[in-house]
């Protein structure tokens, strides 16, 4: 056998190109042909020669020993045995040497014709069905008509066997003897051979220009789509040619590679049986069929038998490559489907996710965790035995170094005996050697933290109580894993970055995570809570005055002063300017104790401590005095909290639960209201829907009132020292919801729903009036079980969804890394206060904190410069900006960052987990994904605790003034009317009325709201109103259509059974007319109101509307004609939440999207066409747009309404993609961020906007080409912004030839520079020939495309990352055709190929650094200078 070059790949490569393998390249890599299906000899257990495990091809089974045993030992290295032909080498070569199988006939690769879109099919223009007929030997295809072309037979015609034989009979005999290249010869083939023949003859360049021409000029939409589909594949091959040889005919194989035997092992089991990889079975089938076919051809078997055998060989190769797609899959015994190459790659158990992205780790252990209250924040307790096992190699080395033992073996024995010297050494080894603790599920980066281990007795790991929040751990049997960082770099990283004391802040929102909770907070609350003396309970030391804090502490220690006593103390404090002052304060003795531990930079904290307050204090401590003192503070506070909780002795008794006495009165009153609503319903005044909604509202209100009284009673009980109230109020345990159920009323319960959208009856309308103290009756208990079980079922089902959401988020954002300081962009986003239902959800100071200002910001009052452009907005500046009333600020944002790869630090701003500006090399994408995904998982587990009590979303039915101010209406159109209660009011009849509340002094806008159509006004334009005053109100349960004139009613096309049906309500005996969708599309129900002076207005009536007027009756202006019920009162829990988050990130269009106007203009109704109403919007400058609204939809606009761009014409949810196209990327980002924040805010989860922005940046990173111009892009193609810009830049100042004239150099359609054109024309002019005509090259036009996160992950630049995410086979086959290059720039692809990830110190710029001593460097510089000086002389 020839010596051959080493085919192993060096590990320091920087990119990977994937392409189709040519037969030559497979042969070049192969060590020999496998011709026998045998594996090993059943007697000797040695591999059979020429078989699948052959040693001659793949290398020896034992190190340095040939097959026959003639050469043994390393000294014969490299010799090839003359008897058996096996090279004497190591056995590990069996992991890398490949073989091959030479097939008798070509075979099509299943990936390229089975998986849709079929690559071979598109290239040749065959549908999949026809392709299958060729490949599986059912039809012949004409590949060269030859002389039969005259008889109408053409290229690519299909022939049955009879037709083929008839043609052969009719041919002249010599025709078949001609050479294949002779155009007169008739050739028809079947099977992959035909495809190979046709693919090899394709001229891609010609085909490309033909298809482009067709896509441009064809009138049929279908044929154009077809042409573009084919063009995509053609262009992929043409593009690949620029990087690597890639021929279409290589999609058909003549040679199959056989992978190394160690990668498909055959393992002997006990009892003489063997376990084998499925690939061996699949390979055997291929070899057996190939050999049989060879024999059949040799003995000249009949065509029928040959054809059947060829088909079977094709199927065998299909199942080797992909056994899951085929109808007739190959199965092992017990009907288990064999795992083919595709199955080995894809899925969670596939090569990518199981072995490359998730490896198992050595030097690790796991154990149960228990609390370690006396540990420092950076410490954890590690069981001795565990430590001895984990650090064994280190101990062995020290034992040998100290000369205690001589060999490793004896050292091992010593460690196993656990002699005292071992513990001594272990103590030393552990100094400065941190360990990592990890709690599954690892949802964010704080689930793995480093600690300094302390050796402890016992078998459980001790964990510091403050890190439980980050790990989401509790001590009910949780287990944690321990990992040992081995290398110096790993130890440095663990100690400097991952140590628990460095991870106090939460990267999702910048608030401290390591904050005392549970009993610690209860102890601190108890300590800082004051109590006044009463005759029964005198408080020691009340009213005393102390000279210093020390005196107070002596008083407490000696029992003279109670910790709850109100006292006066002289203390050091900070004034407004931050200067230290001394003064006397009224405080509580316990607070003086607490302040002993507070850094003096914060001054004296004179407040009752709750968990929120303590979180705020911790964050101030961290900011003002740094990490190490913050850690010290937390440890002190932890001990103080535990000590006082133990001293307080807070218990939980039945009598601590107080039931408010007023509860029963409130319930009776509510019962009366409910009866009144029921009466109204029975009299037919309201619909069933309204009745349900009103009842739910009554009970929701009563429940809230009862809760308020309950809280008051608890607070007044024992001066607020009621133990349940203390637990709840301090934030230690229990929520208002839970306490309400104990002592108030359980209230309304949710019931399980089949569908997600709330249909009527999402909430059971009979509330549970009892609480847990009084006890529930049987019916109430039964209703309760609904909710409780729903909670448990949700938890079980939704956790997987949340995990999958996190996985998709990480995948889409994994390559977002900060790569440069400043991208220099001039764009940014405008940030204002975020308002949610009249309340400030997030103030402008919270939203701008840690961002970089885009422009200089000046104080509006003094005109002083507050922040320079490009400077960070700090806490102080943010607070000041809010105080002076600046309403909006432009800041840098990830969305507008123009860094080509990754993002820049200025656009990102502050790193929330450190409170400083983000560094270069931070993996901000992964942090963003974790920050959004981690609460997602928490959201699913949240329902579990409330036990299914439903809280309904209050329905908005009025607008109240948020401040005192002057009213200003915009687009204001009203008519006078009387409301149902008989009051004289104005009613709004314009669609886009806005109300603003202005500050009378400086005309600042205090509130800005949309006023809905049909709202009754309580105020006048320009009126000065007070805070809380009602501006307008409307019916929250029904949309209405009002008449704007007095007159008589006339019905059109309102016919029973055709356009409306009468709904008979059995309980009330009333009938209602409800408009239905008519089968007869010409009938369009409408009502005309004829005025007395002859004018008439026509109103179109939508489906589901309920008529409240009769034909021929009189009506007054401003009265409703119909009511259209709105669907409201949905229960709000996270099941609504998680699917909503997914829907937003996947950018899915809602199930019933609203139709939105793209321009400002006046509405006119058009005719009805095909079940849709045409609606025109015409702007003032004459632009006209047409919209088709299905008749089943409620149209929100009437004739002649003036509406603005983005206003919905029909009801439904707005789709994010229409927001993008109408209002632009910033609007869609605001919409998605606002909707997401609303879901998370309901659960009390705070996520900083910048994380959401990072994900949205990835969703908006691509463009969709609309017109390709003269570029190589295709219409409808998705390209990245930078690729698109480059493509267009290449056409700058270029010309396109439209008539080549007499030029022999240029051809039509060629793109050339203006200079080349000028030169060519000069030459032609000189020779007096016709000149070349050319036009300017047209650039492509594209628009932003909003992709869902799954789509964006699959469209990432790196094919390795995409393949490891989803659709592995499709991604890889498309990448191979494109000859894709992966430059390994993201995290995932580097993990897969085993490189350092390009973040932090793994950035390429650091890899070439040389590290040494400063002295050496200075000496080197000095010697260089000396050398230079001597050279000059």
UniProtKB/Swiss-Prot annotation:
Pfam families: RNA_pol_Rpb1_1 (PF04997), RNA_pol_Rpb1_2 (PF00623), RNA_pol_Rpb1_3 (PF04983), RNA_pol_Rpb1_4 (PF05000), RNA_pol_Rpb1_5 (PF04998). Its EC number is 2.7.7.6. Zn(2+) 1 binds at residues 66, 68, 81, 84. GO terms for biological process: DNA-templated transcription. GO terms for cellular component: DNA-directed RNA polymerase complex. One of its GO terms (molecular function) is DNA-directed RNA polymerase activity. Mg(2+) binds at residues 474, 476, 478. DNA-dependent RNA polymerase catalyzes the transcription of DNA into RNA using the four ribonucleoside triphosphates as substrates. The RNAP catalytic core consists of 2 alpha, 1 beta, 1 beta' and 1 omega subunit. When a sigma factor is associated with the core the holoenzyme is formed, which can initiate transcription. This is DNA-directed RNA polymerase subunit beta'. Zn(2+) 2 binds at residues 823, 897, 904, 907. Its cofactor is Mg(2+); Zn(2+). SUPFAM superfamilies: beta and beta-prime subunits of DNA dependent RNA-polymerase (SSF64484). Binds 1 Mg(2+) ion per subunit. It catalyses: RNA(n) + a ribonucleoside 5'-triphosphate = RNA(n+1) + diphosphate. SMART domains: RPOLA_N. Keywords: DNA-directed RNA polymerase, Magnesium, Metal-binding, Nucleotidyltransferase, Transcription, Transferase, Zinc. The gene is rpoC. Belongs to the RNA polymerase beta' chain family.
């Amino acid at each position: 056998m020839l010596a051959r070059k080493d085919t192993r790949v060096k590990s320091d490569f920087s990119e990977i190109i994937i392409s189709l393998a040519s037969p030559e390249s497979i042969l070049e890599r192969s060590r020999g042909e496998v011709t026998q299906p045998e594996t090993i000899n059943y007697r000797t257990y040695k591999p059979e020669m020429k078989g699948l495990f052959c040693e001659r091809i793949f290398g020896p089974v034992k190190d340095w020993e040939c097959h026959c045993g003639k050469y043994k030992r390393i000294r014969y290295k490299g010799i090839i045995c003359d008897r058996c032909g096996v090279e004497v080498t190591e056995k590990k070569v069996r992991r890398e040497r490949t073989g091959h199988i030479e097939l008798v006939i070509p075979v099509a690769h299943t990936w390229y014709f089975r998986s849709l879109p079929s690559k071979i099919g598109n290239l040749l223009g065959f549908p999949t069905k026809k392709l299958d007929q060729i490949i599986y030997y059912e039809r012949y295809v004409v590949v060269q008509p030859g002389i039969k072309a005259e008889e109408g037979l053409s290229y690519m015609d299909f022939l049955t066997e009879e037709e083929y034989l008839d043609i052969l009979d009719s041919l002249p005999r010599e025709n078949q003897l001609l050479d294949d290249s002779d155009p007169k010869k008739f050739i028809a083939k079947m099977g992959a051979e035909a495809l190979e023949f046709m693919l090899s003859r394709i001229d891609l360049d010609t085909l490309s220009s033909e298809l482009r021409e067709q896509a441009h000029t064809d009138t049929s939409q279908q044929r154009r789509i077809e042409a573009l589909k084919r063009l995509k594949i053609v262009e992929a091959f043409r593009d690949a040619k620029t990087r690597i040889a890639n021929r279409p005919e290589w999609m058909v194989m003549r040679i199959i590679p056989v992978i190394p035997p160690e990668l498909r092992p055959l393992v002997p089991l006990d009892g003489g049986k063997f376990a084998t990889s499925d690939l061996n079975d699949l390979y055997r089938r291929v070899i057996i069929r190939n050999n049989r076919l060879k024999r059949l051809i040799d003995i000249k078997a009949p065509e029928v038998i040959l054809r059947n055998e060829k088909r079977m060989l094709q199927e065998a190769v299909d199942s080797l490559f992909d056994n899951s797609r085929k109808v007739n899959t190959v199965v092992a015994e017990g009907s288990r489907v064999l795992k083919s190459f595709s199955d080995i790659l894809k899925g969670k158990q596939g090569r990518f996710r199981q072995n490359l992205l998730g490896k198992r780790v050595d030097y690790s252990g796991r154990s149960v965790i228990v609390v370690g209250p006396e540990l420092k924040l950076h410490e954890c307790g590690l069981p001795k035995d565990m430590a001895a096992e984990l650090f064994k190699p280190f101990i062995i080395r020290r034992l040998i170094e100290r000369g205690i033992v001589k060999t490793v073996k004896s050292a091992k024995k010593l460690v196993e005996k656990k002699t005292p010297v071992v513990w001594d050494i272990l103590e030393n080894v552990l100094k400065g050697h941190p360990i990592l603790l990890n709690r599954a599920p690892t949802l964010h980066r704080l689930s793995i933290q480093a600690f300094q281990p302390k050796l402890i007795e016992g078998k459980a790991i001790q964990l510091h109580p403050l890190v439980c929040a980050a790990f989401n751990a509790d001590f009910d049997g949780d287990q944690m894993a321990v990992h040992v960082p081995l290398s110096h770099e790993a130890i440095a990283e663990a100690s400097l970055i991952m140590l628990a004391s460095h991870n106090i802040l939460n990267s999702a929102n910048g608030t401290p995570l390591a904050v005392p909770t549970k009993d610690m907070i209860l102890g601190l609350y108890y300590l800082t809570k004051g109590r006044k003396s009463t005759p029964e309970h005198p408080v020691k030391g009340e009213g005393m005055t102390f000279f210093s804090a020390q005196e107070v502490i002596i008083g407490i220690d000696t029992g003279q002063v109670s910790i709850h006593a109100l006292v006066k103390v002289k203390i050091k404090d900070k004034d407004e300017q931050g200067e230290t002052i001394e003064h006397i304060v009224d405080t509580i003795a316990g607070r003086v104790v607490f302040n002993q531990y507070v850094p003096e930079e914060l001054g004296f904290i004179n407040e009752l401590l709750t968990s929120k307050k303590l979180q705020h204090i911790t964050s101030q401590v961290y900011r003002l005095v740094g990490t190490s003192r913050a850690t010290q503070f937390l440890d002190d506070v932890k001990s103080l909290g535990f000590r006082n909780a133990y001293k307080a002795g807070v218990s939980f008794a039945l009598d601590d639960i107080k039931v408010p006495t007023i509860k029963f009165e409130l319930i009776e009153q509510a019962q009366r209201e409910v009866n009144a609503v029921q009466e109204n319903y029975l009299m037919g005044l309201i619909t069933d829907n309204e009745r349900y909604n009103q009842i739910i509202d009554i009970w929701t209100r009563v429940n809230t009132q009862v809760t308020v009284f309950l809280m008051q009673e608890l607070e007044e009980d024992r001066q607020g020292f009621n133990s349940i109230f203390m637990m709840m109020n301090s934030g230690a345990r229990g929520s208002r919801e839970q306490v309400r159920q104990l002592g108030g009323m359980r209230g309304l319960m949710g019931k399980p729903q089949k569908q997600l959208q709330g249909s009527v009856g999402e909430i059971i309308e009979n509330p549970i009036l009892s609480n847990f103290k009084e006890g529930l009756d049987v019916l109430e208990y039964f209703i309760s079980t609904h909710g409780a079980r729903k909670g448990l079922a949700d938890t079980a089902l939704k956790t997987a969804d949340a995990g999958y959401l996190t996985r998709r988020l990480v995948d889409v954002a994994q390559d977002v890394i900060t790569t440069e300081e400043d991208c220099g962009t001039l764009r940014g986003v405008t940030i204002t206060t975020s308002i949610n239902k009249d309340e400030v959800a997030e103030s402008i100071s919270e939203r701008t904190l840690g961002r970089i200002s885009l422009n200089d910001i000046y104080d509006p009052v003094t005109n002083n410069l507050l922040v320079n452009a490009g400077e960070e907005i700090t806490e102080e500046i943010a607070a000041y900006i809010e105080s002076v009333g600046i309403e909006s600020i432009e800041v840098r944002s990830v969305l507008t960052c123009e860094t080509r790869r990754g993002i820049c630090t200025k656009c990102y701003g502050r790193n929330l987990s450190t409170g400083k500006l983000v560094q270069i090399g931070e993996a901000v994408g992964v942090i963003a994904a974790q920050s959004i995904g981690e609460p997602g998982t928490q959201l699913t587990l949240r329902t579990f605790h409330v036990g299914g009590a439903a809280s309904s979303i209050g329905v908005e039915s009025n607008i109240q003034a948020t401040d005192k101010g002057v009213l200003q209406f915009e687009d204001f159109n009203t008519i006078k009317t009387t409301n149902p209660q008989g009051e004289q009011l104005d009613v709004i009849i314009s669609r886009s009325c806005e109300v603003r509340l202005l500050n009378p002094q400086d005309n600042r806008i205090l509130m800005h709201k949309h006023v809905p159509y049909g709202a009754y006004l309580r105020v006048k334009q320009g009126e000065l109103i007070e805070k809380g005053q009602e501006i307008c109100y409307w019916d929250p349960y029904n949309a209405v259509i009002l008449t704007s004139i007095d007159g008589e009613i006339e019905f059109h096309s309102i016919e029973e059974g055709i356009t409306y049906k009468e709904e008979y309500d059995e309980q009330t005996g009333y009938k209602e007319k409800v408009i239905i969708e008519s089968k007869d599309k010409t009938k369009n129900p409408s009502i005309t109101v004829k005025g007395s002076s002859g004018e008439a207005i026509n109103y179109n009536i939508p489906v589901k509307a309920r008529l409240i007027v009769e034909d021929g009756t009189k009506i007054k202006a401003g009265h409703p004609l119909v009511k259209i019920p709105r669907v409201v009162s949905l229960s709000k829990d996270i099941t609504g939440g998680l699917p909503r988050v997914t829907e937003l990130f996947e950018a899915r269009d809602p199930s019933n999207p609203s139709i939105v106007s793209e321009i400002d203009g006046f509405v006119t109704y058009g005719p009805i066409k095909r079940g849709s109403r045409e609606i025109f919007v015409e702007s003032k400058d004459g632009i006209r747009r047409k919209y088709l609204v299905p008749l089943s939809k409620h149209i929100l606009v009437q004739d002649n309404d003036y509406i603005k761009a983005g206003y919905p014409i029909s009801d439904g949810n707005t789709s994010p993609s229409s927001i993008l196209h109408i209002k632009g990327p910033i609007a869609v980002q605001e919409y998605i961020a606002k909707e997401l924040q609303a879901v998370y805010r309901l659960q009390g989860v705070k996520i900083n906007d910048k994380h959401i922005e990072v994900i949205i940046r990835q969703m908006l990173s691509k463009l969709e080409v609309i017109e390709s111009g003269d570029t190589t892009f295709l219409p409808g193609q998705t390209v990245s912004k930078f690729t698109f810009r480059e493509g267009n830049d290449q056409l700058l100042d270029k010309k396109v030839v439209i008539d080549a004239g007499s030029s022999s150099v240029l051809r039509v359609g060629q793109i050339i520079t203006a200079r080349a054109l000028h030169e060519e024309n000069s030459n032609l002019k000189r020779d007096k020939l016709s000149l070349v005509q050319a036009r300017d090259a047209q650039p492509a036009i594209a628009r932003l495309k909003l992709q869902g996160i799954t789509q964006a992950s699959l469209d990432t630049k790196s094919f390795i990352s995409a393949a490891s995410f989803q659709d592995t086979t499709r991604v890889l086959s498309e990448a191979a055709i494109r000859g894709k290059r992966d430059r390994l720039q993201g995290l995932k692809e580097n993990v897969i190929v085993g490189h350092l990830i390009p973040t932090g110190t793994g950035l390429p710029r650091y890899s070439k650094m040389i590290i040494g001593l400063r002295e050496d460097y200075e000496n080197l510089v000095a010697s260089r200078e000396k050398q230079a000086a001597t050279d000059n002389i």
